[in-house]
């Protein structure tokens, strides 16, 4: 495992802190590193709150010359919060390591382009599969226009959900 793996894995751990809290936003984690030391970390707050990058910048205080590791391309549009990409640029980061591109049409590569246009070195694709898996609902909604749906069905061995009389019987256990 190299040093970049370590920081991106931490980003993925942080992103999971947003599980079931951040929709319709994606779960994002961000770690800021300078001179081999973590200077700030963050994850996306519930909708309307700060994004991961803003949380990490706030924790760092001074991010000049730092490398930003982030699980999803920083947003480049203003919604309930300002664009994260501009906050990273204004903070003076020197490098961004991004797991995956944001499929949201309002971003879709624009965040990466803005970073590169200001001279910030950008590397993409580190742990991309894991980052996409973490946000499969968000990604499917933007790439295919459909939600990610999860269904649980319990049936008896003969494919029934109740007896012929309509009376329901336990066919699963609490652990299921």
Language-model features: locations:
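Residue-level signal for inorganic ion chemistry
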Residues: 11, 29, 75, 115, ...
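Short beta-strand scaffold segments in enzyme catalytic cores
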Residues: 27-36, 153-154
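N-terminal nucleotide/polyanion-binding subdomain common to many enzyme families
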Residues: 120-176
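Alpha-helical scaffold segments in soluble metabolic enzymes
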Residues: 10-14, 55, 59, 114, ...
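Zn2+-dependent cytidine deaminase-like catalytic core
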Residues: 32-130
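Short, basic/aromatic recognition patches
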Residues: 3-23, 141
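Short, small/polar residue-rich loop motifs at catalytic or cofactor-binding pockets
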Residues: 24-27, 148-149
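Generic hydrophobic secondary-structure packing signal
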Residues: 7, 11-14, 26, 38, ...
């Amino acid at each position: 495992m190299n040093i970049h793996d370590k920081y991106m894995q931490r980003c993925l751990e942080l992103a999971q802190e947003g599980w079931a809290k951040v929709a319709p936003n994606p779960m994002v984690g961000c770690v800021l590193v300078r001179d081999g030391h973590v200077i700030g970390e963050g994850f996306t707050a519930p909708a309307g709150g700060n994004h991961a990058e803003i949380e990490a910048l706030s924790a760092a205080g001074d991010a000049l010359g730092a490398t930003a590791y982030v699980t999803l391309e920083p947003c480049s549009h203003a919604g309930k919060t300002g664009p994260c990409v501009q906050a990273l640029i204004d903070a003076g980061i020197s490098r961004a390591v991004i797991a995956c591109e944001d499929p949201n049409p309002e971003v879709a590569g624009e965040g990466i382009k803005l970073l590169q246009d200001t001279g910030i070195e950008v590397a993409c694709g580190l742990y991309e599969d894991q980052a996409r898996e973490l946000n499969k609902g968000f990604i499917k909604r933007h790439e295919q226009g459909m939600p990610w749906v999860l269904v649980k069905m319990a049936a008896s061995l003969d494919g029934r959900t109740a007896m012929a009389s309509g009376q329901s019987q336990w066919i699963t256990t609490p652990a299921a």
